Amino acid sequence: MAEIVDCFADRPIIVGSGLAGLIAALTMSPEPSVLVTRSALGAETSSAWAQGGMSVSLSPDDNPSLHLADTLAAGDGLCDAVAAESIILEALDAFHVLQHFGIHFDQDSNGHLALGLEAAHSRRRIVHVGGDRSGTAIVQALTACVLNDPSITVLEGLEARHILMADNVVCGLLLANPTSEIVLPSSRILLATGGIGGLYDATTNPVSNFGQGIAMAARAGAVLADMEFVQFHPTALHCHNRPLALVSEAVRGEGAVLINERGERFMADIPGAELAARNIVAQAISAEITRGGQVFLDARQALGARFSTRFPTITALCHKVGIDPVHMPIPVCPAAHYHMGGIAIDHQGRSSIPGLWVAGEAASTGLHGANRLASNSLLEAVVMGTRAARDITFHNTPHPLGTIPITPKKPDTTLIRPIVSQCLGVLRHAADMHRAIAALLPFVEGEEESSDPAIVALLIAIFAYLRTESRGAHARTDFPLKHDTTQRRHMTLEDVLEIAHSCVAQRKEKIS
């Protein structure tokens, strides 16, 4: 039986210690809050692994309108333009917030901010820290601030398992570790639980990030949005490790080119070439690999000996697998990297469930549309983490705890990853998605270790099955063209289960 911990009653609970969670906790201060993280504070978060940086218009030839135009173009017709504009207009504020918390962005030899260029950006607007150590440096600085703030209680080593509801509103959170189970009563929960890359064999995310926040919110009845859109980073370091190391877009921004095993630059004739939107580059690389070829990122001519200075982290990662990027091309492949979909929220971070806010990759704001523009994710995390935190401070209506369920088992993705990797990858087809839906449904309804990962995977599969076009990061070989008009899709888990059962029944009829 879970122990009810009353000493933190009705404090806001923040789940996750990536950029969005850390910023939210610091923004709420001095109001007392509880920050829950399944590992050490700031560890095992995608934020800490970010190499590129944050996008903000700072150069004389740039402005928010150009940034918005690039974002909408990358989003391939599916961005919420109002949400995107409002977030981008706060980019400068987000930049100053990070500076306020002690983050010192890189400067050039003249003492000016060093602005990087990444794929699908029309201007240099990526601020970074320590070359390619942006995420690590930012998370370390914010973690120090959180640990030094007496208003923030940090609970490490606890995994959120279930959102407690009473009369359709949030009333608490059920957490567990290998030795104990506890309940934190609260009418205010902010999920900043990250993405879903851990559902894939090839991922650049922490492998434990399978979408736990999405699964919990879905079981509680929250509306989900755009779940089909999974961004595959085109250039993960191709090796046998899991997760795969990221070879940042910034390397291509500095002039590195993609070649196949014959030394051919296969992106040269594609608009934007190596700096085309991520979905285009990932699909081109996948096509080369599917035909049995190999793909390499060649920085020898563009950077040469400067590579190790500009990209020290990537250099070290390459050296670990026997690659010297100064003298050798880097073997690369696409890997699940970022989820544009998630829990649907409004402009203040509120979900469809009273008392539940969401920020960061777990949320779907509409900023990214069908395909995220590089380095917009850190921007979104800061802006939406700040907004949600401010909104939460205006809401505090305690609700008594309802029935406390049996604690769900610790999630395990082992049985789900092969299904997702084979059927919901860069290139998709209805036959594969049918197989995925049929395979996932028993896990969803089984209440076992695979249940929560299967819920998230099934959401992706059904959303993808219903989108009968290729748009942004969602590419279907059976529907290679885009519809003339399109719209975002919003559904609950109940909606998805109804469609899934119908799909399985139809498949059985065809087989019989």
From Swiss-Prot:
Family designation: Belongs to the FAD-dependent oxidoreductase 2 family. NadB subfamily.
NCBIfam families (UniProt xref): nadB, PRK07512.1
Cofactor needs: FAD
SUPFAM superfamilies xref list: FAD/NAD(P)-binding domain, Succinate dehydrogenase/fumarate reductase flavoprotein C-terminal domain, Succinate dehydrogenase/fumarate reductase flavoprotein, catalytic domain
Record key words, sorted: Cytoplasm, FAD, Flavoprotein, Nucleotide-binding, Oxidoreductase, Pyridine nucleotide biosynthesis
Record site feature (Important in orienting the L-aspartate substrate), residues: E118
InterPro entries recorded: FAD-dep_OxRdtase_2_FAD-bd (IPR003953), FAD/NAD-bd_sf (IPR036188), Fum_R/Succ_DH_flav-like_C_sf (IPR037099), Fum_Rdtase/Succ_DH_flav-like_C (IPR015939), NadB (IPR005288), Succ_DH/fumarate_Rdtase_cat_sf (IPR027477)
Compartments (UniProt record): Cytoplasm
A cellular-component GO term for this protein: cytoplasm
Residues annotated for FAD binding in this entry: 17-20, 46-53, 361, 377-378
Pathway the protein acts in: Cofactor biosynthesis; NAD(+) biosynthesis; iminoaspartate from L-aspartate (oxidase route): step 1/1
Its EC number(s): 1.4.3.16
Protein name as catalogued: L-aspartate oxidase
Catalytic function, reaction form: L-aspartate + O2 = iminosuccinate + H2O2
One GO process term, biological-process aspect: 'de novo' NAD biosynthetic process from L-aspartate
Cofactor stoichiometry and binding remark: Binds 1 FAD per subunit.
Role this protein plays: Catalyzes the oxidation of L-aspartate to iminoaspartate, the first step in the de novo biosynthesis of NAD(+).
Keyword Transcription regulation attributed: no
Catalytic residues as annotated in Swiss-Prot or TrEMBL: R278 (proton donor/acceptor)
GO molecular function, one term: nucleotide binding
